[in-house]
Design a protein with these regions (language model features):
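Glycine-rich phosphate/pyrophosphate-binding beta-alpha loops
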Residues: 61-63, 200, 255
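Alpha/beta catalytic cores of group-transfer enzymes, especially the acyltransferase/condensing modules
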Residues: 10-12, 39, 104-253
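Short glycine-rich catalytic loops that host catalytic nucleophiles or stabilize transition states
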Residues: 195-197, 266, 299-300
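Non-catalytic positions within long, well-ordered alpha-helices that form the structural scaffold/packing
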Residues: 185, 266-269
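Short acidic/polar active-site loop segments enriched in Thr and Asp
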Residues: 88, 155, 190, 271-272
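Short, charged, surface-exposed secondary-structure boundary motifs
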Residues: 303-308
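A short, well-structured juxtamembrane/interface segment
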Residues: 256-264
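FabD-like malonyl-/acyl-CoA
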Residues: 2-144, 272-301
Length: 308
């Protein structure tokens, strides 16, 4: 049976995520401790604390989700004998791609934590707060949404996430996003939900962040992954470290093509995916496809015990 392992992205975080792992599995605790040491901050205190606003700062959110995802994977290895080499492919939603690269031994855990903190800072600082925005658009196909954006001459707006059938996210200037959401509701009678983010991710407004990340990445070693990584940008299995590095930079200001990644899995006979990390966003997305790929979420100790 062909399987893939997938890792969630931003929006999956919640206070206390991974605490059960930290308390019950020494292999998981080591992951959290190593990330704390790499960042020279007590990220665990933020994750396990009570200040949601602090956790939701992008520079904290990104390494936090990665840490919990890898801690989850390590617990699966220890308790269930999970072997990464038994998976045909590995993928992650946006920042989740870094979790995938750590899982595939392409990037060191400590390096991924440092890169993600910098990535979060660069993405936050690329656009002044209040200038950009994002919105989820539901029950519309991506091609129809793109035509509507073009027809109404919203020059700053791009489809930034193509998540699954009937679920897209747009990014752009805040005033244009506000106008678009009103038109979507009034003219197309579709749902348009403004997202609680402080920057317009995965669009051309993030180009300064991509440039900054490009310079920062030069100091880190990225190796060829042990299993192919299906890129958010290319939607093909990537094995070459130089190409992976280029795609990580491109991902910052390009669309997350998650719907196409799931379709790639189906076309390559993947029967089951494991979502390894906080929440169940990816598992829920899998359910929206006409074809069936079983997706099993591993987010808490009960999920862990019941797996396999």
């Amino acid at each position: 049976m062909k399987k893939s392992i997938v890792f969630p992205g931003q929006g999956s975080q919640y206070l206390g995520m991974g605490k059960h792992l930290y308390d019950n599995f020494s292999v998981s605790k080591r992951i959290f401790d190593e990330v704390d040491d790499a960042l020279n901050i007590k990220l665990t205190e933020i994750i396990f604390g009570e200040d949601a606003e602090k956790l939701n700062l992008t520079e904290n959110t990104q390494p936090a989700i990665m840490a919990v995802s890898i801690a989850t994977m390590e617990a699966l290895k220890k308790e269930k004998g999970l072997n990464i080499n038994n998976f045909s492919f590995c993928a992650g939603h946006s920042l989740g791609e870094y979790s995938a690269l750590v899982a595939a031994n392409s990037i060191k855990l400590a390096d991924a934590a440092k890169i993600l903190k910098k990535r979060g800072q660069a993405m936050q600082n690329a656009v002044p707060i209040g200038l950009g925005a994002m919105a989820a658009i539901l029950n519309i196909q991506v091609e129809d949404l793109e035509k509507f954006i073009t027809a109404n001459k919203f020059l700053s707006i791009e489809v930034s996430n193509d998540n699954c059938p009937g679920q897209c996210v747009v990014s752009g200037k805040k005033d244009e996003i506000n106008k678009l959401t009103i038109l979507i509701k009034n003219e197309l009678k579709k749902k348009a939900i403004p997202l609680p983010v402080s920057a317009p991710f995965h669009c051309k407004m993030m180009t300064p962040a991509a440039d900054e990340l490009n310079n920062f990445l030069k100091q880190f070693e990225i190796n060829n992954p042990e299993i192919p990584i299906v890129s958010n940008v290319s939607v093909i299995p990537e094995n070459d470290s130089n190409e992976i590095k280029k795609l990580l930079i491109s991902c910052v200001h390009n669309r997350v093509r998650w719907r196409e990644i799931v379709e790639f899995f189906f076309n390559n006979n993947i029967i089951e995916c494991i979502e390894c990390g906080p929440g169940k966003a990816l598992t829920n997305m899998f359910k929206r496809f006409e074809f069936e790929i079983k997706c099993v979420k591993i987010d808490n100790i009960d999920d862990l015990k019941n797996y396999g």
